């Protein structure tokens, strides 16, 4: 039992040190923040495209209804 304690303690110590280094690197990466990744750009552009399509469809529908009203003289 005693012979296993030292190697396990040593491995635990090395694991905690490497984990702390990973957290520091992750924190440094998150501090940049000014850069947008390609996925974020794609997501923003897709959202803008969908909004523009929705607005265009709404405007087109309104224009068509107005023209139909003018042609039928029903308004």
Swiss-Prot record:
Any Pfam family matching the protein: FSAP_sig_propep
Subcellular localization(s) per the UniProt record: Secreted
Disulfide bridge map: 69-75
Propeptide: 23-40
InterPro entries: Antimicrobial_frog_2 (IPR012521), Frog_antimicrobial_propeptide (IPR004275)
Signal peptide range in chain numbering: 1-22
Keyword Signal: yes
Keywords, comma-separated and alphabetical: Amphibian defense peptide, Antibiotic, Antimicrobial, Cleavage on pair of basic residues, Cytolysis, Disulfide bond, Fungicide, Hemolysis, Secreted, Signal
Tissue: Expressed by the skin glands.
GO CC terms, sorted: extracellular region
Gene Ontology annotations of biological process type: defense response to fungus; defense response to Gram-negative bacterium; defense response to Gram-positive bacterium; hemolysis in another organism
Secreted among keywords: yes
Protein family (similarity comment): Belongs to the frog skin active peptide (FSAP) family. Brevinin subfamily.
Function of the protein: Antimicrobial peptide. Active against some Gram-negative and a variety of Gram-positive bacterial strains. Active against fungus C.glabrata 090902 but not against C.albicans ATCC 10231. Shows hemolytic activity against human erythrocytes.
Protein name, UniProt field: Brevinin-2SN2
Organism placement in taxonomy: Eukaryota, Metazoa, Chordata, Craniata, Vertebrata
């Amino acid at each position: 039992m005693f012979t296993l304690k030292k190697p396990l303690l040593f491995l635990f110590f090395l694991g905690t040190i490497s984990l702390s280094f990973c957290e520091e690197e992750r924190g440094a990466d998150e501090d940049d923040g000014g850069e947008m990744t390609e996925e974020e750009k794609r997501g923003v552009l897709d959202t803008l495209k969908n909004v523009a399509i929705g607005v265009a469809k709404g405007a087109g529908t309104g224009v068509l209804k107005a023209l139909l009203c003018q042609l039928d003289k029903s308004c």
